[in-house]
UniProtKB/Swiss-Prot annotation:
The active site is at D141 (proton acceptor). Mg(2+) binds at N111. The gene is pfp. GO terms for molecular function: 6-phosphofructokinase activity; diphosphate-fructose-6-phosphate 1-phosphotransferase activity; metal ion binding. It catalyses: beta-D-fructose 6-phosphate + diphosphate = beta-D-fructose 1,6-bisphosphate + phosphate + H(+). SUPFAM superfamilies: Phosphofructokinase. This is Pyrophosphate--fructose 6-phosphate 1-phosphotransferase. Optimum temperature is 40 degrees Celsius.
């Protein structure tokens, strides 16, 4: 067995396929005789020295892990600040890594997680500790720079498009005597990728969603209400998909929840769908229903995209390969080779090009009226939701998901008092 262990940690909001990435990491490491330790609840588990020995899990359990949503080892929203501000925490992290002979650190998350992995690699180098840090991409927001798409996004996009298409059939059936406007709120703070993917639900101008509201275009309430009225008068009903992060012309979030922020320092947004529904009811008098799918859109493994599932495993395997090749401060990203047929490959990118960068939708993806997507956007989104990821069902009619044993590794250091 090669000397040293590999530490894997999950960060931020989980997805329908982040465990597929974990399975890719563990499977590839096992094939190369490397033990994988997992941090319980992300980077906090590493700081607390709460580590899990994945070698105690059977091959069958790891195979089932690839079909299970959520985060099997626990995740967290905890951002390490700069090396100057949080130096003691970074040093504690290195102390834990050294105590458990960790030579490879894989951090599975978004922009902030890429930044943390980069800083850990820099500190390890400064301390002369032989550590290879690899970022592993994950986010349903699809806002990571460099990569063509992000593992987790394709499945969330598929859930969104399917949900909007099905809900539209319901609204159309009831519109004559009941609900005329349905508003669906999608995740997406500064980038509207997920809401935009709902555009796949329809083909023609009268198909749902007739209106998509994105952060990339300033929200104009008068224009929005006029469009709703136009669609109801033309087809009898209207479906709206709104990104949670839509902003007005002054850059203020439409659903600003009193200025509160989450643990990453991001604005804590309230319900934009409820706000829009109130405006439609008050100004136009239509009966409105709205929904906030929230965790459902990122945990719906039963609707996972096969493309997304395969890419999630591929970045996990590539991360291990890069680490064992001696690469450092890099992240495996997805490069699109062609649209039709859709082909892709995994390539390494420097972490500093991903850390704390945010990718928004290009203007060419947005219709001139600001209420929908272009054919170019459709060509981008379409292959990402293709195929159905494998999923076993039990005799009870429900998906068979696995719960790992998560056997703890004995601690070697004093308790962390951070």
């Amino acid at each position: 067995m090669t000397n040293g262990n590999l530490l894997y940690a999950q960060s931020g909001g989980v997805t329908a396929v982040i465990n597929a990435t974990a399975a890719g990491v563990i499977g590839e490491a096992r094939a190369r005789k490397i033990k994988v330790l997992a941090a319980r609840n992300g980077i906090l588990g590493a700081l607390r020295e709460e580590l899990i020995d994945t070698s105690k899990e059977s091959a069958a359990a790891i195979a089932a892990l690839a079909q299970t949503p959520g985060g099997a080892f626990g995740s967290c929203r905890y951002k390490l600040k700069s090396l100057e501000q949080d130096r003691a925490k970074y040093e504690r992290l290195l102390e834990v890594l050294r105590a458990h002979d960790v030579r490879w650190f894989l951090y599975n998350g978004g922009n902030d997680s890429a930044d943390t992995a980069l800083k850990v690699s820099q500190l390890a180098k400064a301390f002369g500790y032989p550590l290879h840090c690899i970022g592993v991409p994950k986010t349903i927001d699809n806002d990571l720079a460099v990569t063509d798409t992000c593992p987790g996004f394709g499945s969330a996009a598929k859930y969104t498009a399917v949900s909007v298409r099905e809900a539209a059939l319901d609204v159309a059936a009831m519109a004559d005597t009941s609900t005329k406007v349905f508003i669906y709120e999608a995740m997406g703070r500064h980038a509207g990728w997920l809401a935009a993917a709902a555009g796949l639900a329809g083909q023609g101008p009268d198909d749902a969603p007739q209106i998509i509201l994105l952060p990339e275009r300033a929200f104009d309430q008068a224009a929005f209400l006029a469009k709703v009225r136009q669609m109801v008068e033309r087809v009898g009903w209207c479906v709206v998909v709104a990104s949670e992060g839509i902003q007005d012309a002054q850059g203020k979030f439409v659903a600003d929840a009193g200025g509160a922020t989450d643990s990453f320092g991001h604005a804590q947004l309230g319900g934009v769908a409820s706000f829009l529904a109130a405006q439609v009811k008050q100004e136009l008098g239509y009966k409105v229903h709205w929904t906030l799918p929230d965790y459902l859109q990122r945990s719906a493994r039963h609707l996972a995209s096969k493309t997304d599932w395969e890419q999630a495993q591929a970045v996990g395997k590539a991360a291990v390969q890069y680490a064992l090749k001696g690469m450092n401060a890099v992240i495996p990203v997805i490069e699109r080779v062609s649209d039709a047929p859709y082909r892709w490959k995994i390539v390494p990118a420097p972490l500093h090009k991903v850390a704390n960068h945010e990718k928004k939708m290009p203007p060419s993806f947005l219709r001139k009226d600001g209420f929908g997507i272009t054919e170019r956007a459709r060509r981008y989104f379409a292959p990402l939701i293709k195929g159905e990821a494998p999923l076993a069902y039990g005799s009870d009619g429900l998906p068979k998901y696995v719960s790992l044993k998560n056997v703890a590794v004995a601690k070697k250091l004093p308790a962390w008092e951070g």
